[in-house]
Amino acid sequence: MNLEQLYDVIVVGGGHAGTEAALAAARLGVKTLLLTHNIDLLGQMSCNPAIGGIGKGHLVKEIDALDGAMAKAADQAGIQFRILNASKGPAVRATRAQADRVLYRKAIRTQLQSQANLTIFQQAVDDLKIEGGLVTGVVTQMGLTLKARAVVLTVGTFLGGKIHVGMNQYAGGRAGDPPSIALSKSLRDLDLPVGRLKTGTPPRIDRRTIDFSQMVEQPGDTPVPVFSYLGAASDHPQQVPCHITHTTEATHDIIRNNLDKSPMYAGVIEGVGPRYCPSIEDKIVRFADKTSHQIFVEPEGLTTEEIYPNGISTSLPFEVQVQFVRTIKGFENAHITRPGYAIEYDYFDPRGLTSFLQTKAIPNLFFAGQINGTTGYEEAAAQGIIAGMNAALQIKDQELWCPRRDEAYIGVLIDDLITCGTQEPYRMFTSRAEYRLLLREDNADLRLTEKGRQLGLVGDERWDSFSKKREAIESTQALLYNSWVRVHHNDLFKETLFNPMQHDCRAVEFLKRPEINYQHLLMMDDLNLPELPQEITEQIEIQNKYAGYIDRQQQEIEKLRKHENTLLPETLDYNDVVGLSSEVIQKLNRIKPTSLAQAGRISGVTPAALSLLLVHLKKSRLPV
């Protein structure tokens, strides 16, 4: 490889954000270089061996709809699949896959190595080359200068990474990997707003020392779900169960008696940890009334004896970890193979980014993943695909793109970050989206694949598959509208109908009944409806049964769209807007929202303040 050549895009970091960023840029046809400190760890699952979950599964489906890698890799590595919230409405149902770490890395590496326009090189990056307010390349650990027209940083927890086990601490990007100290210093020298965050991981346990008879077995779903719209159950490896156990009062006593040895409670750790994935120390303190906490006992893979005890993340001293682990049901003789630890790292205030994940200070420098204050593989991958795509679009001199809040959870994620920032690791939940009924897992392709095709992200295989699916849905919906269910059909459904039909109705109206599904319609031979795959019939049922609610949300979106279309000039000085409070002026001048709608999502910006902004725009004869 000629390392003196100019790359269009250099992606720094080969985790979940970096792999999606590199693949996205390369799919758009630009010459892309992925730099990683260790090629063998591309796509490494640094913490829990799982993909998806509430809110997170939605992100994975959206990445897949844009032809990303995560869902396909999860299908090839998933050793247990479940649909969470299966008994609830379609808006909050979410897919989760327990994954084999080794198989997942293998699947990601295979996709990277088979991608045209993408080169992989093993080198850590120590510095950025900045000239004339733009990044022109990177300097690697061994002194190589690699030139680029755009750079995407996806450096995870490696920036200034510090690992804590009890009162002992040492520099590290994660256990066994060095931190990026030089790059952290270089970025701090750019005067970007920086902070510290914390995350943690539990000790790993040898499964041969666990008594599973004391635990509740948790099998996967049957039939086995798939993640990718192009996936099939036949893609999955062997399926295995997980287990559930609980802490005991003895566990809690040991932890309480050793809180003075916890770096978090001793004040040694300055970074804020994830609210929704607290350490076991945090749980014991915050929920002091609880006598036990649930632990999910998850296999790390098919070819390893290591178990991931989800729910006991800790940074207590190793000897204390051994003590409290052995008070947990089934863990009485547990052998810890790796200690739990906490890690602190640098992140940069995401309010310093545009919605395209480019830094406002250096417009051809993009950030994605934990560097922006998020936590989770799925959140990182979602940012990665947007950052990599926009880096490529910028080079091609094409319009950059990010989905709106009403188009995708990816849009919710990015808008939350750039508008509100974050003081703790940000995790996606369905509750963060205003339009949950529109942003379901099942329709991510209908929402995003056509746009992905227009942008150049979506390849022929996915486009052909999607086009056939969409055509089947549309043609069947038309058939349902033009077909009639007659009163005499009551006889077919004596045991099913809550209330018999009083008059003939269109099949589309009949399907809206909660007790009726598409399979019932197939029983009426005179309708001549086609047999269809489950993912298509599910889509047809949801679109019809929730039509009223969906229409109402669409109307709300249209009302708010005028605010999204009311753009705020970047040069607008909010000190000139008569009537705004000093707090609002300060926030608007710092964040520089791009639209009236984004301004309204900033904490403290009231509807009255938005009205004053509108008046100012009209008086100044700025476009409204």
From Swiss-Prot:
Amino acids binding FAD: G13, G14, G15, H16, A17, G18, V125, S180, Q370
Domain of life: Bacteria
Gene3D superfamilies listed in its UniProt record: FAD/NAD(P)-binding domain, GidA associated domain, C-terminal subdomain, tRNA uridine 5-carboxymethylaminomethyl modification enzyme MnmG/GidA
One family name in Pfam for this protein: GIDA_C_1st
Binding site for NAD(+): 273-287
GO biological-process terms attached to the record: tRNA methylation; tRNA wobble uridine modification
Compartments, record wording: Cytoplasm
Cofactor(s) in the UniProt record: FAD
GO-annotated cellular components: cytosol
GO MF assignments: flavin adenine dinucleotide binding
Keyword Cytoplasm: yes
SUPFAM superfamilies to which the protein is assigned, alphabetical: FAD/NAD(P)-binding domain
Keywords from the named record: Cytoplasm, FAD, Flavoprotein, NAD, tRNA processing
Role, per record: NAD-binding protein involved in the addition of a carboxymethylaminomethyl (cmnm) group at the wobble position (U34) of certain tRNAs, forming tRNA-cmnm(5)s(2)U34.
Family classification: Belongs to the MnmG family.
The protein's assembly and partners: Homodimer. Heterotetramer of two MnmE and two MnmG subunits.
Protein name per UniProt: tRNA uridine 5-carboxymethylaminomethyl modification enzyme MnmG
Gene: mnmG
